[in-house]
């Protein structure tokens, strides 16, 4: 059956079938190949796209702006909206839906992007919330397919760190849909929500995926195709969380030793970025000096190794986001 996503919002991978996700990945591969051949499309010619940002961004903003422009769209970047302050989310959605053909939202609450989608009348795309990050997962899966050279259904992906964060959940949703073996690796006190685990395990019955949690590094990483991590305190979280968080998560830091424990010399290291892997950022250096803690979630050696595909992931944000826009709002 042909896949048609015209007019659909992209809020979470939970809303999409494996066939629909496969379609978006195939379209991403195609658009990337055309871009490299110097062929740009015009699927969004004459269309207007607005980007709503509550949280700062490098990759998400650049990916949406470049992707939209390369397909012919006009883009508005909006950071000073009155949404939720002097104007309700519903009213803002209705106004923007009259002027724009697609709306991207990057912010805090998942309920905000859902409310926008409910009332806008045009596709709404989730650029990140505290609960989910679906565009990142498409980029991750595209990157895995390019480097692992086997189907996603044969991939074992281990997310190590705070397994309650949006990246852990987003990867879990994608893995469940695509029949992958996903392990959330971290301390018991930072275990994923039990209801979400059960929900994903239900999805897995249909796709053959395996979704599990482990606090044992040696067992969890054995045979892994991918080791994935994220910073230990997310955007918007209080800095005071660091001392206890670092104490809990240091055993789950991605090190050369952890990579070796996979028993797979080709294990990929992945990270959604930004990353604390050295002291070359003001924030990381300042916090390490003030707190007297090593807050880096990955060793610099691993981050810069041949196994690291983090910058391929970053590039692939653009190709996959372009695919989402073309598929849902294109001509």
Swiss-Prot record:
Lineage start: Bacteria, Bacillati, Bacillota, Clostridia, Eubacteriales
One Pfam family it belongs to: OTCace
Coiled coil feature spans: none
Family the UniProt entry places it in: Belongs to the aspartate/ornithine carbamoyltransferase superfamily. OTCase family.
GO terms (BP aspect): arginine biosynthetic process via ornithine; arginine catabolic process to ornithine; citrulline biosynthetic process
EC number: 2.1.3.3
Listed pathway(s): Amino-acid degradation; L-arginine degradation via ADI pathway; carbamoyl phosphate from L-arginine: step 2/2
Binding site for L-ornithine: 166, 230, 234-235
SUPFAM superfamilies for this protein: Aspartate/ornithine carbamoyltransferase
Keywords of the record: Arginine metabolism, Cytoplasm, Transferase
Keyword Hydrolase: no
Name used for this protein in its record: Ornithine carbamoyltransferase, catabolic
Signal peptide stretch: none
Protein residues bound to carbamoyl phosphate: 57-60, 82, 106, 133-136, 272-273, 317
Primary role: Reversibly catalyzes the transfer of the carbamoyl group from carbamoyl phosphate (CP) to the N(epsilon) atom of ornithine (ORN) to produce L-citrulline.
Catalyzed reactions per annotation: carbamoyl phosphate + L-ornithine = L-citrulline + phosphate + H(+)
Cellular localisation: Cytoplasm
HAMAP family: OTCase
Species annotation: Clostridium perfringens (strain 13 / Type A)
GO cellular component terms, semicolon-separated: cytoplasm
GO MF: amino acid binding; ornithine carbamoyltransferase activity
